[in-house]
């Protein structure tokens, strides 16, 4: 049997993002080179264009903690078998932030067949810009 490097992991996906942590997962390589994957090497970039080894893990997920709110972090993963490491996965990049706080209750004005709804912006965006508001009419 010939053993070769595994294929890289795929589909890095953020599972949980907070102001100080990001949990992400990936799909294990479908071609493992004739030897099971032993572990995964996680690398990250803290927004300074310099990739750094973070940790080896034996499962296909990782939680990066101690992050700074409002900073974008990028990660890639390598799979390792008995022969060696795969090429790097495609990178995943996420912003350490949570949902913004709720804006003040809206003011509603009804005039004939028109309804005008207005509100003040949320007092805190928690490190991420507010890009839209959703209005539900019940």
Regions found by a protein language model. Name each.
Residues 52-59:
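Short beta-strand segments within Ig-like beta-sandwich modules, predominantly Fibronectin type-III
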